[in-house]
């Protein structure tokens, strides 16, 4: 299987004591060729960093983590919101709106990228991502 790792999973791994279930799941499933990150996830993380006060002591290490540990190491595995994903996004947003269940645009972008590349989303936020037929797995649950 091929996986699209969501923001909450990447953030969990940065903790001093990451959730043991997440670490165990990743150890069992990680193969560098089968794990991807969406450009939307990069944007979400960068947004969180930039919201911090420039003097906040967390800002510099978070920026270094994002630019070095994520973008530099996994740059080839970062998937853009490209034309195929944009078409999927338009379809799933229209379907969700028509059904009376509008979806947050960024979550829908991640779902669209996963669908465009036939990926399983790895997230804690299953209810936020479990729509439009995308497969979702929660590594936080045992």
List each language-model region with its residue ranges.
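A generic structural signal for short hydrophobic patches within well-formed alpha-helices
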Residues: 10, 42-45, 86, 129
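Active-site neighborhoods of divalent-metal-dependent phosphate/nucleic-acid chemistry enzymes
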Residues: 47-53, 72-120
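Short secondary-structure boundary/capping segments
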Residues: 1, 26-28, 69-70, 78, ...
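Short, well-structured N-terminal submotif of metal-dependent ribonuclease cores
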Residues: 1-40, 50-67, 142
